[in-house]
Amino acid sequence: MITHTLRPEPKAHYWHITLGFTQTDNAPAVLKLANWVPGSYTIRDFARHIVEIHAECNGQPAALVQTAKNTWHTAAQAGEWRVRYTVYAYDLSVRAAYLTAERGFFDGACLLFAIEGRLNETQTLVLEHLPEGWQTATTLPAIGANVFQTASYGELIDHPVELGRIETLAFEAHGIPHCIALSGHYPDFDRDRLRRDVQRICETQLAMFPDPAPFAEYLFLLHLGDNIYGGLEHRSSTALHADRRSLPPHGMGEANEACTELLGLFSHEYFHAWNVKSVKPAAFAPYDLDRENHTEQLWAFEGITAYYDDLLLARSRVISPENYLALLAKNITRVQRNKGRLKQTLAQSSYTAWHKYYKADENAPNALVSYYQQGSLAALYLDLAIREQSAGAHSLDTVMQQLYRDWLHTRRGIAEGQWQTRCQEITGLDLADFFQTALHTTAPLPLAESLRTAGIRLQYAALPRSHGGGLGTDTLPSEPAPDFGARFSQKADHALLTHILNGGSAEAAALCPGDKIIAVNNYACTDLAGILAAARTGDTLEIHYFRHGLLHRTALTLREAEADTALLYIEDADKLGRWLAGTL
């Protein structure tokens, strides 16, 4: 048995960890710490947070040699080994370790050593000397008070742990125990509403997939803070971060925008229990946590999940059809406004996620396409195409259900290209042209044609960038809006340019990311958005800005905005209702 004992030192943000194991022969043990965490596809080099490390065997100091950035070899000596190390933990995220006097959290991958060749041995986790009053929330199987045990290392690191003062909201979905564990500081909110809405989302997803569910219990670890957002999936739980203002207030009718975003996060990470934690690329079966695990299939595992996360909010009726279409229009608009969609394919976006998407820079809108956003639109088109071509006999639901049955039977990952093959086998349709176009070219998807089959009309309009897309209205501006051609962050006394968009007004004026605009037409730039809202296409703005501490001046002529704002109109409410219900 391998034992991991953790002791917190909250004020220093240190986890003091002891790895204990028996070495039965005179051979070195090889210890490895993960370089990345499943579900977050970039190298994070967790070993850099190790502050000190030493070893002893049979109670005596023993040699421990580092042989790579995340690898250590013990001396070739049989006996009872203890490797003691300290890890700095101050990463406020869902994928690492965090420790203060108020709260602790960790994803086991970033703290716990694996012993090479012994991944399938029983692992015990012990939490010692926790601060008084701290509670523990995790789906790790408990064998005692703050003592947990798993059958393998892979299972050990797939149950994040939340520590501190925790509020719990429990419910059942399809007879399975579920719990929302809330941490952080947050205002009073409608607890019954949150519990009820999340329960409906879970029940809708459980009803979509065949039994048995991939978990016997499920835990949402929800940490609330200020302007934070994110989620990471695990086999029977998920770690979530959300803004404290996103909790449903008392008396709320239709879910507001912030609450809808929170419910979408719950939905997205829960869906991953089937799509990526169960059904997964062969490249992830098993995960190699030493190096990048490249696959062209992230569009199917993240993009399809991103399609269903909001769709299932509508299907479970926690948001209205109109609010769902507003979310869909915003997603279409985000994709349309990124010129990267014309340069990078979905397959390339998936494969290069490790060093491009997760390391996006100021040129990202011009060079990259998101396998989340574009992938969700490919899933939308695929779903509606299957429904139409099969006369309603099949849908993307059918494909996802059968892929899960496949996994229940084989427990194997999906090889490159196999997802597309199985989709066609399951539906009996020839979808080869769609997959070739959608995955391996930058040709636009014919979404307008596709959405008509669901009773929706898609129209693009040249609206200001402040309009992110939504439900259409009867009247549109008579002339296209002007477009500044840059993204910016407004500060108290200047606007900081963050992205310059190819072919736009700002690029033509030779502005650069990082420029600080201090004046427009000789007036202080305290509200650039307001200045642009009052301008018209063809207006020339005199811009004064700082670049690397040097004052510059340029003239910027506002070009016409592209028709890239998506507006959706309901033309057949019956068709729309049947699609959202999954019965079209």
At which residue positions do the language-model features occur?
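Early extracytoplasmic/domain-onset interaction patches
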Residues: 1-35
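Juxtacatalytic substrate-recognition/specificity segment
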Residues: 169-298
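Non-catalytic architectural context of zinc metalloproteases
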Residues: 45-52, 56, 60-200, 204-215, ...
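Intrinsic-disorder/low-complexity, polar/charged segments enriched in Ser/Thr/Lys/Arg/Asp/Glu/Gln
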Residues: 1, 14-18, 28, 80-82, ...
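C-terminal recognition in membrane/secretory proteostasis and scaffolding
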Residues: 309, 319-584
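Post-HExxH zinc-binding segment in Zn-dependent metallohydrolases
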Residues: 238-245, 278-279, 290-341, 550
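A generic structural motif
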Residues: 22, 56, 128, 544-546
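Short aromatic-acidic-glycine turn motif
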Residues: 38-45, 134-135, 519
